[in-house]
Amino acid sequence: MELHDVRWVVGTCIEDTIPALKREWFGLQKGLHVDSYKAITHVDGFAIHLVPSAMAQVEPSKRDQSGPVDRLWFVNLGGYARNSLQEQHQFGLVVARSQQAAKARAKARWLKASLQVHKDDLHGIDSVGDVDDCLPIDGISGWRISLEFVPNAAETDLTPDWFGYWRIDGRLPRPRPEAVI
């Protein structure tokens, strides 16, 4: 069985992120590979900026005083299709001020034709409603996420920048192979 996981890493190119991906992986290193990746620049009209964590230490206190603020969320929905034995999943990124708002935004966009959109307890995440995972993305190993509203901003869809099978466990093949299109 293959275990899939979404990881958030920072680098000037994908090759720069390999040490972090290997270090953060919780399973066996043998067979560790990348299936796809995507650089995220904009979500829901907000530009995504990375700020060194040391420079962003004032944010939590500012957040407490000003009430809810826009945050970047990763949401994974699950549901069923009448013509399939497997559970259907769709995940993506949204900007919202609360977990409930993030869930509502995701459900309005994804798996509209699925039945019984629901929550799986596979990850042990204390989710809200019918969402598998609804996690705020506040920081990534030494970096904080800063959102800047940009009117008429181009959206970043989740079409991969690259996809295929790229082993990063130290065994061949290396380097990253060309994608099959």
Where are these regions (language model features)?
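Intrinsic disorder/low-complexity detector
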Residues: 1, 19, 23, 29-85, ...
